[in-house]
């Protein structure tokens, strides 16, 4: 059976610093849906791009990589409630109908609510996206104009059909109050985000804060081969400021292209805009001085971590170029 891969899609630059709050890897899950006869709704939340497997059928019909409902034979529409992986402010949504050509919904709308206790039935649902026309086998990226914090969303499709992927882009809003808990303060699920970078030719630095170890070399930050003096760098913001106790740098899958060294600079700063941080970052003090790297290896640093009472932003320097898979900053919220 031939397997078709989804066409490459370039995420709008404005969304690069946002988190997909509906990513199953950070805990997003289906709460309930009106129907998923042809394809389970949970497939819609997968991180991987959708595929199409020719001649693959199951007991319900053609296997599709997404959420697909049966043909509606009465008035109404289908819907699905999703618990976001983390609460956040929603800035944009991507309703992806890739490979749904004769079975995509005519239109869709989106609502959201804040229900930290999980009781969506008594929560106040707010409109996020009005009823919007959809097309066959394509991404549909819509801006959202609502500054509230949401824990759940409800996707409504009219009248029925299939959606390959649903991505909810926003800013994580998480307040960790347990100052005794050690956690990865840079992790995606804890609000870490990318601010800027020198190069991302082969892999984006947002992969550095993804959950788990990298699945392959593409699931990391990799720059082009440097032909001029200097080195590559990226700026990242912690979800909440904290005191760093341990650093992990993982070069998983990078074997002939890992950097010679990596160093990390850090600062605690309030009220600075992202563009202001870029030139300032060159002069930040070191949190971790340059360390030699090995291929396909987790490098752990305890005694090498330099004293900082509080860190809110870091600059990762990859010397001179190459690729790393993950960066973890273990510490406590201050």
From Swiss-Prot:
Pathway: Nitrogen metabolism; (S)-allantoin degradation; (S)-ureidoglycolate from allantoate (aminidohydrolase route): step 1/1. Its EC number is 3.5.3.4. The keyword Chaperone does not apply. Keywords: Hydrolase, Purine metabolism. It catalyses: allantoate + H2O = (S)-ureidoglycolate + urea. One of its GO terms (biological process) is allantoin catabolic process. It comes from the Bacteria. One of its GO terms (molecular function) is allantoicase activity. Signal peptide: none annotated. SUPFAM superfamilies: Galactose-binding domain-like. InterPro entries: Allantoicase (IPR005164), Allantoicase_dom (IPR015908), Galactose-bd-like_sf (IPR008979). Belongs to the allantoicase family. This is Probable allantoicase. It comes from Acinetobacter baylyi (strain ATCC 33305 / BD413 / ADP1).
